[in-house]
From Swiss-Prot:
Monomer. It comes from Hydrogenovibrio crunogenus (strain DSM 25203 / XCL-2). NCBIfam families: aroA. It is found in: Cytoplasm. This is 3-phosphoshikimate 1-carboxyvinyltransferase. It catalyses: 3-phosphoshikimate + phosphoenolpyruvate = 5-O-(1-carboxyvinyl)-3-phosphoshikimate + phosphate. It is an enzyme of class 2 (transferase). One of its GO terms (biological process) is amino acid biosynthetic process. The keyword Amino-acid biosynthesis applies. The lineage of its organism: Bacteria, Pseudomonadati, Pseudomonadota, Gammaproteobacteria, Thiotrichales.
Length: 445
């Protein structure tokens, strides 16, 4: 496959139909990790066959775990127990995945073998001190490149100690890393988060029979506690559709004329539904149908119709609950009447790229008044028709997909560069986009 895939987006019709987007990336990663260190056989359905979660799968195979699949989203994991992983004979390549690297660091910190975690050029620029620092407090020994960046060289350690750790930022990845290291630590490990973040790790640990206590300290803070030395028992996992992937089509339907779209079996974990809450505050016509709980995770069909969106000041409490969805929420803001203000989102600057600056540049290129700020953006919306432009995605899958949605209401073709990384999270994106009424082609250049 060519390194440069361009998306060419023609202005399209309306958005209609029923679709199911691929499995949730966060839950897919965790199903492999916990299934591998559980005792017994775990069957996973709905697994996301994207590059990121496949990197996690291959890493555990390299550490001696027998994993069959994926075959149409079905994976069988023959767990080896907490102490059953073997030293891999090569560095473990996490590709583009910050989630994989940070969570794996927690599991590997308590092993009795040395291991190195590496990643692609983008991942190699991302901050890892946020996980290596608390792990060092627990007794782990981890070497990093300059500035606390990957690769991570993790030395053997069999005497981790539990810690009480207050997160300096709301980060599910850091919280999960510390909790996973806590499985291997003596005593209790406690993490206090300053604002709610996704809780898939805690839910899945409880599902595997490993007790985790969560206690609300106040409206924002939560304390999560587990004790080391237990065991995980295999459990089958049905991975719901990824709300982060569904978000692109939610916005597409909201901004298109005469749209009516149903996205099936979407994970609506309350720590992930910030995108729905924000769109509703903007006036989006969104309803949940067929609500159910599957394997401890709430799911529903999400129905979205054409909406007259208005600009809002996005509540900072919702920022951690929609952190991955802001690129496409910026596109919604561009179509909304009035001003949208985002603050408290400095985390966006250290994602796969600086998503604040890159999205501001992309929106300006298509004719939007978008002003980046240190921790967010100010967008003056009301755009009826986006201008034709060539957009630089900076190899960021979510920028590529967000600007594809911006092309729905353009005057003529929008070209987006460097879209190969869309396959990390949403390999069927173009196919589904064209199914519901967009007009997108991928071209190797």
């Amino acid at each position: 496959m060519s390194n440069n895939i361009q998306f060419k987006v023609q202005p399209g019709g309306t958005i209609k139909g029923r679709i199911r987007v691929p499995g949730d990336k966060s839950i897919s990663h965790r199903s492999i990790m916990l299934g591998s260190i559980a005792e017994g056989v775990t069957q996973v359905t709905g697994f996301l066959e994207g590059d990121d979660s496949l990197a996690t799968l291959k890493a555990f195979q390299a550490m001696g775990v027998e994993i069959e699949g994926p075959n149409q989203g079905n994976v069988t994991i023959h767990g080896v127990g907490l102490k059953g992983l073997k030293k891999p004979d090569h560095p473990l390549d996490m590709g583009n995945s910050g989630t994989a690297m940070r969570l794996m660091a927690g599991i590997l910190a308590g092993q009795d073998f040395e291991c190195e975690l590496i990643g692609d050029a983008s991942l190699s620029k991302r901050p890892m001190k946020r996980v290596t620092s608390p792990l060092a407090d627990m007794g782990a020994r981890i070497d990093t490149a300059e500035g606390g960046k990957p690769p991570l060289k993790i030395h053997p350690s069999s005497d981790l100690k539990g810690i009480d750790y207050t997160l300096p930022m709301a980060s599910a990845q850091v919280k999960s890393c510390v909790l996973l290291a806590g499985l291997y630590a003596e005593g209790e490990t406690t993490v206090i988060e300053p604002a709610p973040t996704r809780d898939h790790t805690e839910r899945m640990l409880n599902g595997f029979g490993y007790p985790v206590q969560s206690e609300k300290l106040d409206e924002m803070q939560t304390k999560v506690t587990l004790a080391g030395g237990g065991k995980l028992t295999a459990k089958n996992i049905d991975v719901p559709s990824d709300i982060s992937s569904a978000a692109f089509f939610m916005v597409a339907a909201a901004v298109a004329e005469e749209a009516d779209l149903v996205i099936e079996h979407v994970g609506i974990n309350p720590t992930r539904t910030g995108v729905i809450d924000i769109l509703k505050l903007m006036g989006a016509d969104i309803t949940l149908e067929n609500e159910a709980t599957v394997g401890g995770e709430p799911v529903a069909d999400v129905r979205i119709k054409s909406s007259k969106l208005k600009g809002i000041k996005i509540p900072e409490a919702l920022v951690p609950l929609a952190i991955d969805e802001f690129p496409v929420l910026f596109v919604a803001a561009a179509s909304a009447e009035g001003q949208t203000i985002l603050s408290g989102a400095e985390e966006l600057r250290v994602k796969e790229c600086d998503r604040i600056q890159v999205m501001a540049d992309a929106l300006v290129a298509v004719g939007i008044d978008a002003q980046p700020t240190e921790d967010g953006m100010i967008i003056n919306g009301g755009l009826q028709k986006a201008q034709s432009a060539e957009i630089q995605s900076h190899h960021d899958h979510r920028i590529s997909m967000a600007m594809t949605i911006a092309g729905l209401n353009a005057v003529s073709e929008i070209t987006i560069d460097d879209c190969a990384n869309v396959r990390t999270s949403f390999p069927t994106f173009i196919e589904l986009a064209n199914t519901v009424g967009l007009n997108v082609t991928a071209v190797e250049v």
